[in-house]
Amino acid sequence: MLTSGIIVLSGGLLDPNPGLIFWTTVTFLIVLFILKKFTWGPMLSALEEREKGIKNSIDRAQSAKEEAEAVLNKNRQLLAQAGADADKIIREGKEYGDKLKAEITEKAHLEASRMISSAKDEIDQEKRRALTELRTEVADLAVKGAEKIIMANLDAEKQKNIVDSMIQELSQHRN
């Protein structure tokens, strides 16, 4: 009960007391000075350091993003260039194939023409040789026939029989 009486005598906690206000203010200022002297600087430094770290992280992220975009653009350009190069290689290969095909076809036609010409020349030579041989045989047979006619001094009927037999010999000799 005694404690209740002290509270009642002093007027309560919510009543303004000038001594209490003074000492509370002095204590607050001392604590504020101590905080400012010893903790405020390191706290501000830590906050500034954190702010710089966050800003650096944002700057690095922005740089990385720009670098990634540059690499992406470069890769797109390289891909487009590779596609163009592939198209060029395909086109050149096709042109080379067409050119090679034309050359081979031309060579084949020339070779065929040469072979045909050679065969015709060979046929003509064989034909001339056969004709020469035939003329020689006909001349020989004619000479033989003339010799027989002259030697036999035969009549017209016998001469005709001799010529016919020589023609038959020639026909048989040809076959």
Curated annotation (Swiss-Prot):
Main localization of the protein?
membrane
Has the keyword Ligase been applied to this entry?
no
**Which keywords does the record carry?**
ATP synthesis, Cell inner membrane, Cell membrane, CF(0), Hydrogen ion transport, Ion transport, Membrane, Transmembrane, Transmembrane helix, Transport
Please give, as recorded in its UniProt entry, the membrane topology of this protein.
Single-pass membrane protein
Q: Where would you find this protein in the cell?
A: Cell inner membrane
Keyword Glycoprotein present in the record's keywords: the answer is: no
Q: What is the annotated role of this protein in its UniProt record? A: F(1)F(0) ATP synthase produces ATP from ADP in the presence of a proton or sodium gradient. F-type ATPases consist of two structural domains, F(1) containing the extramembraneous catalytic core and F(0) containing the membrane proton channel, linked together by a central stalk and a peripheral stalk. During catalysis, ATP synthesis in the catalytic domain of F(1) is coupled via a rotary mechanism of the central stalk subunits to proton translocation.
Q: What is this protein called?
A: ATP synthase subunit b
Q: Which gene encodes it?
A: atpF
